[in-house]
Regions:
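ATP/Mg2+ or Mg2+-diphosphate-binding catalytic cores
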Residues: 303-356
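ATP-dependent phospho-/nucleotidyl transfer catalytic cores
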Residues: 32-36, 58-59, 66-69, 128-140, ...
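All-alpha amphipathic helical-bundle segments outside canonical DNA-binding/catalytic cores
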Residues: 137, 287-297
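Juxta-kinase regulatory segment immediately upstream of eukaryotic protein kinase catalytic domains
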Residues: 2-29
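Conserved active-site aspartate in kinases
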Residues: 240
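Active-site activation/catalytic loop segments of kinase-like enzymes and analogous catalytic loops
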Residues: 250-284, 299-319
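Conserved ATP-binding subdomain of kinase catalytic cores across diverse folds
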Residues: 38-41, 46-48, 52-55, 60-176, ...
Length: 356
């Protein structure tokens, strides 16, 4: 979550704010913090009068998503599209937004001189995340779900969805931000991060085709954005629709490979093969460019490392961290993944040739 967008409050304060907001939906809510996302504050919400009913309550980060009306409008549009994609809707449960008792998509809360927007999702019963994945079958199933998600949205016109985060996943934009922050960073900060600044400066050139949007993407294909059943045997749902927008199809694939490698301690050739097989199955017969399947993991790992590094040098204004220096550590981890992907490009190329 962003320090600016949500405010730096302790757990007790956040629980108080969330409890007050939850009354826009329920008379007798109980709740607890849920997950450790970087962007939103999220809570598991129950109804004391109907304890079997559970929900996910989120405070949307307005510093990251400046136009919350646009965000919610597009979320509804995507959900409507997924509902009409019969094959996808038959295989996976769709996330369900719950309107307030006044029929609003969000509840706007005024507190401490700040305005906060809250939304409520129905909790998908019997679901859990598998992060890290326990086996390659889970990796393959997650990849297939994300591929099928792209396929379900393929009929939408690319211009129907606007950027919910201006410049999101734009390498050229992130490089400009990096340059701007680097120009004003302190000497001490630059010296501390010198090896990673040098790495960022030496890898500024990428295939131009990989940087051009060519379809609708999920935009946040982390392994924890699919929900499995309690046995971890089947994907129940694809969640987190905030970043659905136009993009390059390979960004979703690359981000999943990056996410799996990060959660399992590094690049593994069989994990990559499972991602590739699942994603290709989910996408169906749509022709894909092999080179992009090879470059995409490096592209996404480098991009995320660059974003963490930029935020560290700029004072941690986007990604919330307990201590200054944590974003630099995150950058180092992503850059290490990037270097691992670069070392294994030839191997990935052989696997792509085998599976295509």
């Amino acid at each position: 979550m962003s320090a600016k967008g949500l405010g730096l409050k302790n757990k007790k304060q956040w629980l108080g704010l969330a409890h007050a907001a939850a009354r826009a939906w329920l008379d007798a809510p109980t709740l607890e913090l849920l997950g450790n996302g970087h962007i939103h504050q999220t809570f598991l919400l129950s109804d004391q009068e109907k304890p079997a009913d559970r929900y996910v309550l989120q405070c949307v980060n307005s510093a990251v998503y400046g136009d919350i009306d646009l965000l919610m409008r597009q979320t509804r549009m995507v959900l409507d599209r997924l509902q009409t994609a019969s094959a996808f809707a038959a295989e996976y449960q769709l996330p369900e937004l719950i309107s307030t008792r006044l029929g609003e998509s969000v509840f706007v809360q005024a507190s401490d001189g700040e305005m906060r927007s809250w939304r409520l999702w129905r909790f998908i019963k019997g679901s859990k995340t598998c992060d890290p994945p326990e086996n390659r079958q889970q990796i393959r199933q997650a990849a297939q779900a994300f591929g099928a998600y792209q396929r379900a949205l393929a009929g939408m016109e690319i211009e129907q969805l606007h950027e919910t985060i201006p410049g999101f996943l734009s390498m050229s934009g992130y490089l400009r931000q990096f340059d701007q922050v680097l120009a004003t960073a302190t000497l001490a900060e630059c010296e501390q991060a010198a090896p990673w600044i040098a790495l960022a400066q030496s890898h500024r050139q990428w295939p131009s085709a990989l940087m051009q949007p060519n379809g609708i993407i999920h935009g946040d294909c982390k392994i924890n954005n699919v929900l499995f059943d309690q046995q971890g045997e089947r994907v129940l749902s694809v969640i987190d629709l905030d970043n659905n927008m136009k993009g390059h199809w390979a960004w979703d694939f690359g981000d999943l490979v990056r996410s799996v490698a990060f959660s399992r301690g590094g690049f593994d050739v069989d994990d990559y093969r499972a991602c590739l097989q699942g994603f290709l199955t989910g996408r169906g017969s749509t022709p894909l460019i092999n080179e992009h399947l090879i470059y995409a993991p490096s592209y996404l790992a480098f991009m995320l490392g660059l974003r963490f590094l930029t935020d560290h040098l700029g004072g941690d204004v986007y990604f919330s961290v307990p201590e200054h220096g944590d974003n630099l550590q995150r950058a180092m981890e992503q850059f290490a993944l990037f270097q691992s992907f670069e070392r294994n490009k030839a191997l990935m190329g052989r696997i792509v040739s085998e599976c295509s």
